[in-house]
Each structure stands twice: as structure tokens, then as C-alpha cells.
């Protein structure tokens, strides 16, 4: 029987109230899927790690849910369907799943064909010298957009999606900072100096639909890097609407590229987030692509 794993904390806890409706839909199916809504990340990981290798699971939640459960999905090589009920849903957007009503998305997640997608892996060192290993599906942000992600997580519950991200962006502009970063992509030295952000994308969007890297692909065997120089507040306000439209790539001070391996060094420590989930301050970051490492159900992409 297929495991359906619900994150009851997704969308500010509102997904918990949808459990009876999800159960009613599943009760009509044969064979009956197994429905679980674990309260902790560890409980969810334990459930996934007990699944037979290569079996199908369905996740109900958003980018953060997938990110927290990703280590088990990769280890067990699970074929994964996604019902996007999170605040951001940038992974679902890239897979063509974001416009479906949830019962239709659930039916597709249970029965749809899977396709291999790339993931990223970040090995990073925090300010205490401790090493961490973090996989991601959508984005690994460093700098301003990570600070925005943290502020968004702390934002008012009545805001969700893109409005919540824009609220956090405007609040973070009041505390604008820059970071001195040394970077290399596939052995090639990138520009040194202060940056507003130095981020990695696997999906075209981040932050609930901001088109940070419009041409990014989840299945091309590469990741995309995005560097923005030391823009001030006025420059950021000029850049923001272009980010929303995906027309920022040709702006002075913005650089992009593709890679398989990327290294970042920031002695002062740069804010880091994966799939919108806060990680901490990092001095060293090594990122590489894990090509075709996750089997995902896709929509019309």
C-alpha cells in the first residue's frame, strides 16, 4: 500500500485541518493507501526509511516538507508524488503541479508517471567549524535572500505565498547588508568582492514564484548560480520588480552561470537557506549537482 505522508505543520498549520478531507478521498481508493501525519521530522524520516527501496510515496506539503524529508527519499530511492499544500511551492511550480486542485494533485501523485530530476547537495561549515550536509531540490540561497527566508518564516501567519515573501523582503531592506565572497564554479574563479546574494537555483523560481532563474531546469544535469553585487536600497527596489518578471539577468551587477560544482568562501559568515528553510551562517560552502537522483511525478511540463 502506498504511503501518503502529510506535514500537519505546512501552510502555517492549516494542512492539519485538511486531514479529514484527505482521508475521505483516500477511503474511496483500492487498495487503500496508508495515511500518516507525523508531528516531527524524525518521525517522518523513520516512516520513509522503512519503505521498500524504489516504492512510491506521496508527500502532502510544500518545499520545506520535501526538503526536510529529502534525505530519506534519496537514500531509499523512493518514487515521489507531491500534493503542493505549502506556502512557497516552487518545486511544484517547476514540475507543473502548482495549478491543480488538491484532490486532482493527489490522484496524479498516486498514479502518475515519474521522471528523474536533479537535486543539489551542499556541504557547509558553520561559524563553529562544524560541518553539515544538506540536500535540496529547488534552491540554496546565500546572502540577502536567505535573510529574507528567515524573516518570512517568522512573519505573520495570515500572510502566505508571494505576499509573505514580499513583506519579508521589504522588512529586510531596512537592515541591508553585503558579504565578501570568494567563489569558484567548476574550477573557474568568479568575481571576488561584496555581494547582495550568491545563490544556487535548480528551479526557475524561489520565494513563492519569484523568477530568479527563468531558464533553470530540474533535469539538465546542472545547477545555476546567481550573483548580485552590492546593490543599495534604491538599487534593490529597482531590481525587485525585475526579479518578479524574470527580466533582471541582463542588469549591471547581476551575473549568472551554470555549474556542476561550486565553492563559496565567506570568512564573516553568510546567511544560508535551502528550499526556503533557514540553515545558519556559513563560512565555507561546497555545492554539487546530483544528476537524475530523485524520481518525481510531474504534471504538464
Q: What do these predicted regions represent?
A:
Residues 141, 145, 199-213, 278:
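Glycine-rich phosphate/pyrophosphate-binding beta-alpha loops
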Residues 152, 213-216:
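Short Gly/aromatic-enriched secondary-structure transition segments
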Amino acid at each position: 500500500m502506498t504511503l501518503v505522508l502529510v506535514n500537519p505543520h505546512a501552510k502555517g498549520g492549516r494542512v492539519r485541518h485538511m486531514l479529514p478531507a484527505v482521508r475521505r478521498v483516500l477511503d474511496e481508493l483500492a487498495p487503500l493507501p496508508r495515511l500518516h501525519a507525523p508531528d516531527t521530522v524524525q518521525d517522518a524520516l523513520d516512516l520513509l526509511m522503512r519503505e521498500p527501496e524504489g516504492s512510491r510515496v506521496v508527500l502532502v506539503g510544500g518545499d520545506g516538507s520535501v526538503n526536510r524529508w529529502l534525505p530519506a527519499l534519496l537514500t531509499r530511492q523512493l518514487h515521489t508524488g507531491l500534493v503542493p499544500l505549502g506556502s512557497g511551492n516552487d518545486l511544484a511550480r517547476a514540475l507543473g503541479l502548482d495549478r491543480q486542485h488538491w484532490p486532482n494533485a493527489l490522484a496524479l501523485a498516486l498514479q502518475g508517471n515519474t521522471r528523474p530530476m536533479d537535486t543539489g547537495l551542499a556541504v557547509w561549515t558553520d561559524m563553529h567549524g562544524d560541518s553539515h550536509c544538506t540536500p535540496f531540490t529547488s534552491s540554496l540561497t546565500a546572502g540577502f535572500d536567505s535573510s529574507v527566508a528567515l524573516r518570512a518564516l517568522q512573519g505573520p501567519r495570515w500572510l502566505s505565498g508571494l505576499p509573505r515573501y514580499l513583506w519579508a523582503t521589504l522588512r529586510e531592506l531596512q537592515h541591508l547588508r553585503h558579504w565578501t565572497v570568494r567563489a569558484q564554479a567548476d574550477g573557474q574563479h568568479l568575481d571576488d568582492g561584496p555581494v547582495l546574494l550568491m545563490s544556487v537555483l535548480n528551479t526557475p523560481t524561489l520565494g513563492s514564484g519569484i523568477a530568479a532563474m527563468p531558464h533553470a531546469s530540474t533535469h539538465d544535469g546542472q545547477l545555476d548560480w546567481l550573483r548580485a553585487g552590492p546593490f543599495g536600497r534604491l538599487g534593490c527596489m529597482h531590481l525587485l520588480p525585475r526579479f518578479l518578471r524574470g527580466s533582471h539577468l541582463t542588469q549591471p551587477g547581476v551575473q549568472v552561470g551554470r555549474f556542476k560544482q561550486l565553492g563559496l568562501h565567506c570568512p564573516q559568515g553568510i546567511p544560508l537557506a535551502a528550499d526556503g528553510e533557514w540553515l545558519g551562517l556559513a563560512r565555507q560552502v561546497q555545492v554539487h549537482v546530483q544528476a537524475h537522483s530523485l524520481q518525481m511525478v510531474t504534471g504538464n511540463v
